[in-house]
Amino acid sequence: MVSATRSLLCAALPVLATSRQATGAPVANELRCQCLQTVAGIHFKNIQSLKVMPPGPHCTQTEVIATLKNGREACLDPEAPMVQKIVQKMLKGVPK
């Protein structure tokens, strides 16, 4: 019985290893930086919300993603002085 189970597992292993779910394809897309290009700044009045994502296993850089009032998203350069001012303004606007 044990050898039959072992044979079945050995036969199924190549099929499982080559399937899309077994390779983790969707996870690989999530484990990368979202911002490939950044802009130095966008006018504060055009920003609806702001996401600041610290470095982590998915990306070694801090990422600042602005959702604009027209629904589009823009990656901002976290090192740019204008972006740092925008982040500070957004933080001050958050009720405590």
Swiss-Prot record:
Signal peptide: 1-24
InterPro entries referenced in this protein's UniProt entry, alphabetically: Chemokine_b/g/d (IPR039809), Chemokine_CXC (IPR001089), Chemokine_CXC_CS (IPR018048), Chemokine_IL8-like_dom (IPR001811), CXC_Chemokine_domain (IPR033899), Interleukin_8-like_sf (IPR036048)
Keyword Signal (UniProt): yes
The family this protein is said to belong to: Belongs to the intercrine alpha (chemokine CxC) family.
Tissue specificity note: At least expressed in the lung and trachea.
Pfam family, one: IL8
Family annotation (CDD domains): Chemokine_CXC (cd00273)
Keyword field contains Membrane: no
Paired cysteines (S-S): 33-59, 35-75
Alphabetically ordered keywords of this record: Cytokine, Disulfide bond, Growth factor, Inflammatory response, Secreted, Signal
Gene Ontology cellular component list: extracellular space
Summary of the function given for this chain in its UniProt record: Has chemotactic activity for neutrophils. Contributes to neutrophil activation during inflammation.
Protein name (record): Growth-regulated alpha protein
Induction: By lipopolysaccharides (LPS) and inflammation.
